[in-house]
Amino acid sequence: MKEQQKETEQNIEEINDETVTEQIETDVDTLEKEAEVDPQQVEIEQLQSDVKELEDKLLRAQAEIQNIQQRHARELQTVRKYDGQKLAGAVLPAVDNLERALQVESEDAVTQQIKTGVEMTLGTLVQALRDNGISATGEVGETFDPTKHQAIQSVASDDVASDQIATVLQKGYMIQDRVLRPAMVAVAK
C-alpha cells in the first residue's frame, strides 16, 4: 500500500508538473504575443497623438489671431474717434482770439467790415470743429460738472441757482466724450 501511495503521489506530482508547465508555457506565449506590438500600430498611435497636439496648437493660434484682430479693430476705432484731438488743441487758441476780437466795440465802417470777416472765419472754424465731433462746453446756467469745468471762483448770483455756472471766463471743448480743455467758470454760491 505504501508503494501504491508513493506511486499515486508520483503520478499526481507528474500531472501537477505537466499542468503547471503547460500553464506557464501558455502564459509565456500570451505575454510574448502581448509584447509583440505591431510597429505600424505604434507609429499610428504616435501620429494620432501628434495630430491632436497640432490641432490644439492650431485652435490656440486661431483664437490668438482673432483676439489680435478684435484688439486692433478697437484701437483703430478709438484712433478714428479722437483723431482730431491734437489739431483741435492747436486751433482752440485761434478760436478764443477770434471770439475776443468780436467782443471789441466799434463804430466805424471799416472795423465793422473786419468784424464781419472775423465772424465768418470764426463760424467756419466752429463748424469744422463741430463736423469733427468737437463741441463747446460751459454755458451760463449749466450745472457745474468738475469733469468738464474748472471753477475759478465762486460768486453770489440772483440769476442762476447754486452750483450752476454764473459766468464763463473761457469756453471748454470736448471731442466726442473726452474733455479737450475744461471750461474756466465762475460758479454761483
From Swiss-Prot:
Keyword Transit peptide: no
InterPro entries documented for this protein: GrpE, GrpE_coiled_coil, GrpE_head
UniProt region (Disordered), positions on chain: 1-22
Coiled coil feature spans: none
Origin: domain of life: Bacteria
Family per record: Belongs to the GrpE family.
Quaternary organization: Homodimer.
Predominant subcellular localization, coarse grouping: cytoplasm
Intracellular or extracellular location(s): Cytoplasm
SUPFAM superfamilies xref list: Coiled-coil domain of nucleotide exchange factor GrpE, Head domain of nucleotide exchange factor GrpE
Biological processes per GO annotation: protein folding
Name of this protein: Protein GrpE
Pfam families attached to this UniProt entry: GrpE (PF01025)
Molecular function GO labels: adenyl-nucleotide exchange factor activity; protein homodimerization activity; protein-folding chaperone binding; unfolded protein binding
Record's keyword terms, sorted: Chaperone, Cytoplasm, Stress response
Physiological role: Participates actively in the response to hyperosmotic and heat shock by preventing the aggregation of stress-denatured proteins, in association with DnaK and GrpE. It is the nucleotide exchange factor for DnaK and may function as a thermosensor. Unfolded proteins bind initially to DnaJ; upon interaction with the DnaJ-bound protein, DnaK hydrolyzes its bound ATP, resulting in the formation of a stable complex. GrpE releases ADP from DnaK; ATP binding to DnaK triggers the release of the substrate protein, thus completing the reaction cycle.
One cellular component (GO) term of this entry: cytoplasm
KW Cytoplasm (keyword) present: yes
Gene: grpE
PROSITE patterns given in the database record: GRPE
Biased composition annotated in UniProt, kind: Acidic residues: 10-22
